[in-house]
A protein has these predicted regions:
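Aromatic- and Gly/Pro-rich donor/ligand-binding loops
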Residues: 2-142, 148-153
Length: 153
């Protein structure tokens, strides 16, 4: 049951800081996205809504089995860091599908990739990256980019 006076917030994360989940489940479901730095990044975005009760947050994550039944939210927090990379098609397809289903405000920060300073090769999933960015442009007023290369998208 959610608190009706506070916003309902969807968060792209494998787990919330207030959850008690076993290490084995965290690792077997890759709820940290490959490294614990992802948790620091995603959890820091929760501070924007520190006055919202925990029951108003819903998590969605590519490695979680549960599927959303209700797509009615006030905000979708989308903390991404290294989204632009090879072999990330599954996550991009998941996020594109989700973005098409929601109508709430999207708060995106830190999108990009780990690019070298000299030269840049095109990714094989360039079309998915562009589709993802085009959807984001429709859903948010600003996109926080990680670097100059990401800004080119």
């Amino acid at each position: 049951m959610t608190n009706q006076e506070s916003p309902k917030i969807l968060v792209y994360t494998g787990l919330f800081p207030w959850e008690n989940i076993s290490k084995s489940r965290i690792l077997s479901n890759d709820l940290i996205g490959g490294n614990t730095g992802n948790l620091l990044f995603s959890w820091s975005t929760l501070n924007i809504f520190s006055d919202v009760p925990h029951e108003n947050f819903t998590k969605v994550y590519i490695t979680l089995e549960n599927q959303l039944i209700n797509y009615e939210f006030d905000y979708f927090l989308l903390p991404l860091a290294n989204t632009f990379r090879e072999n990330n098609d599954e996550e991009l397809i998941f996020l594109i599908s989700l973005l098409k289903k929601i109508s709430c405000k999207v708060l995106l920060n830190g999108i990009g990739g780990q690019f070298g300073k000299v030269g840049f090769h095109k990714f094989s999933n360039e079309q998915l990256i562009r589709e993802f960015i085009e959807l984001l442009i429709e859903k948010t007023t600003s996109i926080g980019v990680r670097d100059e290369r990401t800004k080119e998208y």
